[in-house]
């Protein structure tokens, strides 16, 4: 495995590369866990996932489809979208848009525990859950990466702020 990060004034690029140096094939799952600080999770929206299919982890990974509108947060959200599209996080409270571009990824994970779920899993205490959202490139579940001997796979995510 190798991880590489590079940045300039406008962007941050993260790449996670796995190489099968063994003699037998294997599968693995990966996600580039990015937790963005937001002004108020109930006031932000994610665009780029409209009409994408997803599995809802808050409901036993039930298959769903995102309506033709932005993802918003009015309760617990734990979704694995089958989408390679770039995503934009719009946060008017902080006056910014974060652009998330991905490659080597068949999925996008979106997560915020909300209350009371965040308290139950002890991942988010007090009101901290109101001020972050996770939006990340992923290769998991049925989209796990299979590597034959000698093969490599790179999962890359590039973030930029406007």
Regions of interest found by a model, annotated:
Residues 25-27, 35-109:
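Active-site/ligand-binding surface loops and adjacent short beta/alpha elements
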């Amino acid at each position: 495995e190798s991880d590489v990060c590079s940045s300039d004034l406008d962007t941050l690029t993260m790449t996670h590369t796995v190489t099968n140096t063994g003699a037998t094939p294997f599968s693995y799952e990966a996600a580039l866990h990015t937790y963005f600080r937001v002004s108020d999770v109930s006031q932000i929206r994610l665009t780029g996932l409209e009409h994408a299919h997803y599995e809802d982890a808050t409901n036993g990974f039930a298959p769903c489809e995102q309506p033709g509108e932005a993802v918003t947060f009015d309760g617990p959200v734990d979704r694995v979208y089958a989408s390679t599209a770039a995503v934009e996080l719009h946060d008017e409270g902080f006056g910014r848009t974060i652009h998330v571009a991905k490659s080597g990824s068949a999925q996008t994970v979106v997560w915020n525990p909300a209350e009371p779920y965040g308290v139950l899993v002890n991942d988010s205490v007090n009101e901290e859950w109101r001020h972050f959202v996770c939006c990340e490139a992923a290769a998991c579940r049925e989209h796990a990466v299979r590597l034959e001997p000698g093969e490599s796979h790179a999962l890359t995510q590039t973030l930029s702020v406007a």
